[in-house]
Swiss-Prot record:
Protein name: Leucine--tRNA ligase
GO cellular component: cytosol
CDD domains given in the database record: Anticodon_Ia_Leu_BEm (cd07958), LeuRS_core (cd00812)
Taxonomic placement: Bacteria, Pseudomonadati, Pseudomonadota, Gammaproteobacteria, Enterobacterales
Short sequence motif named 'KMSKS' region, residue ranges: 619-623
GO biological process, one term: leucyl-tRNA aminoacylation
EC id: 6.1.1.4
Binding site for ATP: K622
Catalytic activity: tRNA(Leu) + L-leucine + ATP = L-leucyl-tRNA(Leu) + AMP + diphosphate
Keywords annotated in UniProt: Aminoacyl-tRNA synthetase, ATP-binding, Cytoplasm, Ligase, Nucleotide-binding, Protein biosynthesis
Record's subcellular location: Cytoplasm
Length: 860
């Protein structure tokens, strides 16, 4: 064994061994308990970043630990390879998205191997290959036949100059990212999948997900947004149709003083025919895309349509306004406004001088003060005619019943969730398998024409999708008749909604899934990824699983038993102000810093002498230039060091602060482990351990070893607090470094301890552990070694520490046998100099003894 720890030599050697032996390839084995450990698949952007490294290290630690427990562990990896960034990169680099993507995959695959992740590479998949997306296309056609897919018009961002649709991220300050033309909103036909048909099940089954973070479940509950309320119909004077609104607060209905409709509502459009102000307002709303997140904070604007609706219970005429906070795609595109009891309605009414009518009493029974804000709490009704004096629930039911009896109301359950629009007017995605015949009939692409292959040898102009620009591509024949293919492609969330299931049978040619393999491995036992995916990906992931279940492919209701959302990786961020006042961000690698005695950064400059402003720790990002390249760190310290730091620096679900000093610390620790094994093995062979012949000190050390095994097992397995597991191993290492190594049993005990330490560290730092296991002559490869089991007998304490007090003040701490009697403890305490001093010449009036813990002698 060489004396120095040289990761650059051992890591490549061990990785080659894993490749040659196909160590992590698995097949179904009914005789073994399975464990499916999955990290969210990466987008092949070109290089791994520290967020990837953290995610995949957590997954690898769990997978290797479960493997050592004797389970049949599947840990696959693949590439979420379609998407908009490839189009931009292709234009920039004068290439096509396909070669750019495949080059990135090859590069990043090597990076993953360099980090020593134990993946089953035989299952690797890339979602941009026809072998993958053909089954997604087939499944889509089946959903269409089931009535779960439909087409309707929906608004998109449209660049009138380039005559093209823009993704949300391509709209910058309301303008096209490429030509700076003002972006318009345009309605175009798009494909939707009826996720709303599964809304109740998606909501109710959250209760089955005991091992998902509550934050994620709450976000999904709110996103699905189930509410119970009443749909109310208003007659509108001088208008051919009625207006329907939905409210969850029918108890406030007597306080409704105006209605608001979306700018795109037919009533607003009709009113605008003779109202230039309203027509201009509608235009403004049409060209302003409002994300729901921004709705709460944006300025509320509106224009009176001139129409008057009739309140069905009071007969009063109330105005109908067009307002920018009402969206056509939500509900009916019309809302009732109760400004006395809804803050948004209150602000709008105050701004435009509309009537504000209170109908709910304040908590103390007085009329509410509405001079500053609305009263939004529930309470007792007044100012409401026959409903006065009713509390919230009674009023809800009474008003709902009355409206129903009059034929103008209906109790309804509503959802915030909208159907999933899967059409994208992009090139680099899976073609949507639908065709239109000459007579206008729309139908699915026949099975014998699947997959509809996306041409990869294309020229990108940065404006129009190559399959839209080439009229020949769309031409096809169906049943001998000419037809045109759909030129939209799927939302890339489609591919990432079912990849986890395809990993169970990546070579299967007969269909989307081999049910036997899928049902052996599924559901996923632990799924690891960022909380930013809580509502989009993780909802579609659950939805797709239910679709596949209902198609008879899988027999479970949910795709993953446990979800672990890892925290973000933070790093120091620095900038200097340029000549034009702009911020120039400087990489923390290039910052020369001064620290105070507490290690805080007080001053910083770069190599060019710029005084730097330190903004603290923030998420690693390109915009702040504070990303740390994992490859550089691996080349400097080795993969094991980077992995160990990642798992030690912070609990897995909390943010991790990148500190190179911490990486250096992890490296020093691994050098200490190496050195201890080197010194131990240099002394030659070891005798067998005789546990019955150990001295008290040897027993105490062995107790520490087995207590550490018990703690680390619990920390990794049950608690998943990996940082505390590493801390416990480090603490044990400190004790082993000080332990005597001269006697035969000292060395036998050291052998047992080091074999345990190396196995406990193996999930975290597999390369060094593989090597040290061989040097310690462990049985076989460590990859097939069992997890160490704590010896219960070794952990039993045969002595205990008792605190001795005289009149409540601590005078000594003594070690006594665990079975010592009170008399024996008193006798032993009396031998302590300080205790004897305070007992000299006084009478012990009372003895308080807590067995094995405390002896208090009360004297007087």
């Amino acid at each position: 064994m060489q004396e120095q720890y040289r990761p650059e030599e051992i890591e490549s050697k061990v990785q080659l061994h894993w490749d040659e032996k196909r160590t992590f390839e698995v097949t179904e084995d009914e005789s073994k308990e399975k464990y499916y450990c999955l990290s969210m698949l990466p987008y092949p952007s070109g290089r791994l970043h520290m967020g990837h490294v953290r995610n995949y290290t957590i997954g690898d630690v769990i997978a290797r630990y479960q493997r050592m427990l004797g389970k049949n562990v599947l840990q696959p990896i693949g590439w979420d390879a379609f998407g908009l960034p490839a189009e931009g990169a292709a234009v920039k680099n004068n290439t096509a998205p396909a070669p750019w993507t495949y080059d990135n995959i090859a590069y990043m695959k090597n990076q993953l191997k360099m980090l020593g992740f134990g993946y089953d590479w035989s299952r690797e998949l890339a979602t941009c290959t026809p072998e993958y997306y053909r089954w997604e296309q087939k499944f889509f056609t089946e959903l269409y036949k089931k009535g779960l897919v439909y087409k309707k018009t929906s608004a998109v961002n449209w660049c009138p100059n380039d005559q093209t649709v823009l993704a949300n991220e391509q709209v910058i300050d309301g303008c096209c990212w490429r030509c700076d033309t003002k972006v318009e909103r345009k309605e175009i036909p798009q494909w939707f999948i009826k996720i709303t048909a599964y809304a109740d099940e998606l909501l109710n089954d959250l209760d089955k997900l005991d091992h998902w973070p509550d934050t994620v479940k709450t976000m999904q509950r709110n996103w699905i947004g189930r509410s119970e309320g009443v749909e109310i119909t208003f007659n509108v004077n001088d208008y051919d149709n009625t207006l329907t609104v939905y409210t969850t607060r029918p108890d406030t209905f007597m306080g409704c003083t105006y209605l608001a409709v979306a700018a795109g509502h037919p009533l607003a459009q009709k009113a605008a025919e003779n109202n230039p102000e309203l027509a201009a307002f509608i235009d403004e709303c049409r060209n302003t895309k409002v994300a729901e997140a921004e709705m709460a904070t944006m300025e509320k604007k509106g224009v009176d349509t001139g129409f008057k609706a009739v309140h069905p219970l009071t007969g009063e005429e109330i105005p109908v306004w067009a307002a920018n906070f009402v969206l056509m795609e939500y509900g009916t595109g019309a809302v009732m406004a109760v400004p006395g009891h809804d803050q948004r309605d209150y602000e709008f009414a105050s701004k435009y001088g509309l009537n504000i009518k209170p109908v709910i009493l304040a908590a103390d029974g007085s009329e509410p003060d509405l001079s500053q804000q609305a009263l939004t709490e529930k309470g007792v009704l007044f100012n409401s005619g026959e409903f006065n004096g009713l509390d919230h629930e009674a009023a809800f039911n009474a008003i709902a019943d009355k409206l129903t009896a009059m034929g103008v109301g209906e109790r309804k359950v509503n959802y915030r969730l909208r159907d999933w629009g899967v059409s994208r007017q992009r090139y680099w995605g899976a073609p949507i398998p639908m065709v239109t015949l000459e007579d206008g009939t729309v139908m699915p692409t026949p099975d014998d024409q699947l997959p509809v292959i996306l041409p990869e040898d294309v020229v990108m102009d940065g404006i129009t999708s190559p399959i839209k620009a080439d009229p020949e591509w769309a031409k096809t024949t169906v049943n001998g008749m000419p037809a045109l293919r759909e030129t939209d492609t799927f939302d890339t969330f489609m591919e990432s909604s079912w990849y986890y299931a395809r990993y169970t049978c990546p070579e299967y040619k007969e269909g989307m899934l081999d049910s036997k393999a899928a049902n052996y491995w599924l559901p996923v036992d632990i799924y690891i990824g960022g909380i930013e995916h809580a509502i989009m990906h993780l909802l579609y992931f659950r939805f797709f699983h239910k679709l596949m279940r209902d198609a008879g492919m899988v027999n479970s209701d949910e795709p993953a038993k446990q979800l672990l959302c890892q925290g973000m990786v933070l790093a120091d961020a620095f900038y200097y102000v340029g000549e034009n006042g702009e911020r120039n961000w400087v990489s923390p690698v290039d910052a020369i810093v001064e620290r105070d005695e507490k290690g805080r950064i007080v001053k910083a400059k770069d190599a060019a002498g710029h005084e730097l402003v330190y903004t603290g720790m923030s998420k690693m990002s390109k915009s702040k230039n504070n990303g740390i390249d994992p490859q550089v760190m691996v080349e400097r310290y080795g993969a094991d060091t980077v992995r160990l730091f990642m798992m030690f620096a912070s609990p897995a679900d909390m943010t991790l602060e990148w500190q190179e000093s911490g990486v250096e610390g992890a490296n020093r620790f691994l050098k200490r482990v190496w050195k201890l094994v080197y010194e131990h093995t240099a002394k030659g062979d070891v005798a067998a351990l005789n546990v019955d012949a150990l001295t008290e000190d040897q027993k105490a050390l062995r107790r520490d070893v087995h207590k550490t095994i018990a703690k680390v097992t619990d920390d990794i397995g049950r608690r998943q607090t990996f940082n505390t597991a590493i801390a416990a191993i480090m603490e044990l290492m400190n004790k082993l470094a000080k332990a005597p190594t001269d006697g035969e049993q000292d060395r036998a005990l050291m052998q047992e301890a080091l074999l345990a330490v190396v196995r406990m560290l193996n999930p975290f730092t597999p390369h060094i552990c593989f090597t040290l296991w061989q040097e310690l002559k462990g049985e076989g490869d460590i990859d097939n070694a069992p997890w160490p089991v704590a010896d219960e007998k070794a952990m039993v304490e045969d002595s205990t520490l008792v605190v001795v007090q005289v009149n409540g003040k601590v005078r000594a701490k003594i070690t006594v046998p665990v079975d010592a009697t009170e008399e024996q403890v008193r006798e032993r305490a009396g031998q302590e100099h300080l205790v004897a001093k305070y007992l000299d010449g006084v009478t012990v009036r009372k003895v308080i003894y807590v067995p094995g813990k405390l002896l208090n002698l009360v004297v007087g």
